[in-house]
């Protein structure tokens, strides 16, 4: 772009700007020094539709220009990566209200539209480049942005000379999916262990780590060669990053990692920085509101989100072939899509011989025989087809003679399912002694609580290195209280929530309505901050008796009335799915419009099979 055109574009954009008015969100409380928020953009075009554009990540040139105009007059202070590095190493403080702007993928608009705006407003930004896209591996880039619509190294160097543009790696060639299960799903290349179809196996840890390290080193070396400076950051494609990847990135020479789609405030010593993903062609006013929301909510809003869930055994989707299993999965997802809940809890182990101990798994593991490898496929399809957050439930003691087995199983689950939404440990009645007035301080009970707490922490430690940080996976503990003896339940919950994101209480309340309501009255004494982190599960009736189903329905409504918004049912199956839809749709569904009601998506007479 020549200077004359740059000036003309700047003048044209300036004429479209809106005056700074009261509609823009104003900071009421400053972001502290040495803290930073980050917004992420992608392509910038003149013709982005106000709604329903072909690219949900694109923003209209006018909207970005108006945002820059507002930003330059606001209390926000745009900073560089260099500023964060100096704050880390030299103790040079970041200003109040620091903001880091990032643009991913290296679309041509980085040079033709964003760069002129940076110069006009003297605002710095970071651009994340998939280096192989600039070196001829253009297929994925052209599919995303169109033929020839990527920046080249000459343009990148011109931007760098201005001092307003810094460049980070977006990997060399990890901006795509890789085969992640035998059924054929492709998932983010960085966090997924590849399924090697010709060998009918997954990558080993060593193979996976070497593949990622080789890619990052190559991208690092390309950026250093082309730009003459040591690159500082890796911006992970799709925001897919975990603790294992953080360490590999540091080996490759990257001191900063960036995730995606996760709102929050960053501190200068964070290893991975959260970035808020801008979508749907946000206006300047909406972008200013986004910044204010980040300041006001931060991480604590994570617990305010409702969870309406069904819990089921994964073995119900098993079959003699993957094709037959897929048919079962497809029908399940159709039913959940009709129900309009938002969370699915799967139990991926099974007790085949009925001895009370789990002896087979439905995911790749060396800890016990694998009956069928269907967990990853089920999880991915539930997320992408039915909009379900998927939580995996493991018994605290799958096998009594192996006290630490659950931690090893959780590790394998997380390795091959980095995008899961949570892991729930089922402690059953193990802590019921701590809910009773008379036994709270007895030595046996205290020891039992201590052992379970240690095992819980060990399990979290085993799984966390593999979980995608952008997904904000949560750890929960499932308890089955005795409704007759729960005097100390509130005190126990407060204690457990110091080690768990959530605590789930399961009740079989059919025929015990009085005791159940008393339990709810006890839970209602808790402050809202605790209620936000409590899940309640009701066991489904084993028969079709209308009265029993009506009791469960009323129980779910009663849960809502005391301000608990995370609730669901256990024992979901093809046989009772129609009854769930018939009796429990109103409390379970998150559908707020009768116009959007979906009828039951089951096959005729399926429940009679």
Task: Give the location of each predicted region.
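Aromatic-lined carbohydrate-binding/catalytic grooves of carbohydrate-active enzymes
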Residues: 76-86, 94, 135, 339-372
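Active-site groove signature of glycoside hydrolases
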Residues: 100-105, 345-352, 408-445, 504, ...
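Catalytic domains of carbohydrate-active enzymes, especially glycoside hydrolases
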Residues: 60-79, 125, 327-353, 412-423, ...
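Aromatic-lined carbohydrate-recognition surfaces of secreted/lumenal glycan-active proteins
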Residues: 230, 237, 387-403, 450-489, ...
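Substrate-binding cleft of secreted/luminal carbohydrate-active enzymes
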Residues: 37, 260, 264, 342-343, ...
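His/Asp/Glu-enriched short active-site or ligand-binding loop at hydrolase and phosphoryl-transfer sites
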Residues: 130, 134, 192-205, 226-230, ...
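Metal-dependent polysaccharide deacetylase catalytic core of the NodB/CE4 family, i.e.
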Residues: 44, 98, 119-240, 273
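Active-site beta->alpha N-cap acidic-glycine motif
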Residues: 52-65, 70-77, 81-166, 174-176, ...
């Amino acid at each position: 772009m020549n200077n004359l055109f740059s000036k003309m574009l700047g003048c044209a954009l300036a004429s479209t700007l809106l005056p700074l008015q009261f509609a823009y969100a104003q900071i009421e409380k400053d972001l502290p020094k040495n803290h930073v928020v980050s917004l992420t953009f992608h392509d910038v075009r003149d013709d982005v539709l106000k709604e329903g554009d072909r690219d949900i990540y694109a923003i209209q040139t006018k909207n970005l220009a108006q945002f820059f105009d507002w930003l330059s007059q606001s209390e926000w202070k745009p900073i560089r990566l260099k500023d964060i590095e100096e704050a880390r190493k030299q103790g040079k403080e970041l200003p109040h209200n620091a903001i880091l702007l990032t643009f991913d993928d290296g679309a041509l608009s980085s040079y033709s539209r964003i760069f002129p705006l940076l110069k006009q407003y003297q605002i710095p930004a970071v651009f994340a480049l998939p280096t192989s896209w600039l070196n001829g591996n253009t297929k994925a880039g052209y599919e995303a942005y169109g033929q020839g619509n990527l920046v080249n190294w000459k343009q990148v160097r011109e931007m760098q000379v201005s001092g307003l543009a810094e460049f980070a790696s977006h990997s060399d060639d990890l901006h795509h999916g890789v085969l992640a299960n035998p059924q054929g799903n492709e998932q983010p290349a960085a966090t997924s262990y590849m399924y090697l179809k010709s060998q009918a196996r997954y990558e080993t840890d060593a193979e996976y780590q070497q593949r990622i390290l080789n890619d990052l080193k190559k991208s690092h070396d390309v950026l250093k060669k082309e730009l003459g400076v040591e690159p500082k950051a890796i911006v992970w494609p799709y925001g897919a990053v975990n603790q294992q990847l953080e360490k590999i990135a540091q080996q490759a020479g990257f001191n900063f990692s960036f995730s995606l789609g996760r709102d929050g405030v960053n501190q200068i010593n964070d290893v991975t920085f959260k970035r808020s993903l801008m979508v749907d062609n946000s206006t300047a006013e909406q972008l200013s509101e986004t910044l204010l929301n980040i300041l006001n909510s931060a991480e604590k809003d994570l617990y305010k989100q409702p969870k309406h869930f069904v819990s089921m055994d994964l073995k119900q989707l098993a079959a003699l072939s993957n094709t037959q299993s897929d048919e079962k999965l497809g029908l399940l997802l159709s039913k959940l899509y009709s129900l309009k809940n938002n969370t699915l809890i799967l139990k991926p182990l099974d007790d085949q011989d009925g001895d009370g101990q789990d002896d087979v798994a439905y995911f790749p593991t060396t800890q016990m025989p694998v009956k069928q490898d269907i967990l990853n496929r089920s999880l991915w399809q539930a997320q992408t087809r039915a909009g379900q957050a998927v939580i995996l439930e493991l018994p605290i003691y799958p096998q009594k003679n192996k006290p630490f087995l659950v931690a090893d199983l959780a590790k394998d689950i997380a390795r091959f399912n980095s995008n899961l939404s949570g892991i729930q440990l089922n402690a059953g009645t193990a802590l019921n002694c701590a809910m009773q007035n008379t036994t709270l301080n007895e030595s046996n009970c205290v020891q039992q609580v201590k052992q379970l707490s240690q095992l819980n922490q060990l399990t979290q430690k085993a799984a966390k290195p593999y979980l995608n940080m952008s997904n904000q996976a949560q750890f929960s503990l499932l308890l089955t209280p005795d409704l007759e003896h729960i005097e100390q339940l509130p005190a126990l919950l407060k204690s457990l929530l110091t080690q768990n994101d959530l605590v789930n209480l399961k009740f079989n309340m059919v025929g015990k309505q009085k005791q159940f309501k008393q339990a709810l009255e006890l839970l209602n004494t808790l402050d809202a901050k605790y209620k936000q982190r409590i899940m309640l599960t009701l066991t489904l009736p084993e028969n079709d008796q209308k009265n029993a189903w009506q009791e469960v329905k009323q129980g779910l409504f009663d849960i809502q009335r005391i301000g608990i918004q995370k609730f669901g049912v256990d024992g979901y199956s093809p046989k009772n799915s129609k009854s769930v839809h018939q009796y429990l749709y109103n409390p379970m569904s998150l559908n707020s419009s009768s116009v959007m009601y979906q009828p039951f998506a089951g096959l005729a007479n399926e429940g009679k099979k």
